């Protein structure tokens, strides 16, 4: 009788263990668009621009590898309450995880998972082309962890028009293959440089990934330079609807703001953007966050030398194109300078009322081409102004 009871207990225990294993496996099984990803080691040569798609899929721009990599973060649980992320010395915490000093950590981009509200950072262990790429997750409790790339559902697509490396150039074009990304209506929009005559490019890549066609290349009027330009990459952009039409609002170094019709961004097309604002020279835009507050539309723009700007976006369709040298350094769409935000290095939307910023002292170099920020680097939640 005792033996029989023991066997029954063992059988029940095994059944519970199997059921638990199935439950865990089901919880980890990719869903939605993430189900198209396959487990294995994600091969990244660098980790730069980030963007989130549906179902917790994180897109990583790998400029050195000339590819975009989609990762299943397995991070699809919504928080039970309002999230505020505040972490002092996040670079110090990352350095401790990988066994280096904080000055060997460079944070390249910041995005918030729209489902879980966890913060994701692309970073590098070391400096230069041989640096080790890292993807870092920070939760609302301030816990910092690495997203393992060794066995993760993923997929990648190679860019057919990536520029060749040129270490003798003032700024290596290969390192600017991907400068910013956004997921827009089933496509990953990828800004950066290409190997075309008009080297400034915007690529539209359908997801799930199959192949990437060549991007559209761009020409813009740069009023502070007094000329049309085709070689300067978009630094940051957001999709935006103006009078019912889909546009890309793109910001460039020194600092034209340009609208580009999405309908014209066909493979191989040469597209002329329309400059609608000149925000000021001697500056590099870092990130943009569009939002609505008190019945009005705004775009918050983080910059290297201009600080944080609050752009009024209610009537973007009413501003005439800027296509000739301007008398002043600032023209077009009006904005307010926000002096209460200092040393912002990264900006990302958290929800409809808040954003997350990464702050740190500016690195060496001119403000339009700054070096890596100097730590300590801090994550902070702010209210959208």
Across the structure, where does each feature detected by a protein language model lie?
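Helix-centric, low-specificity signal for extended rod-like, repetitive segments
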Residues: 2, 21-22
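Sequence/structural signature of beta-propeller domains
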Residues: 25-385
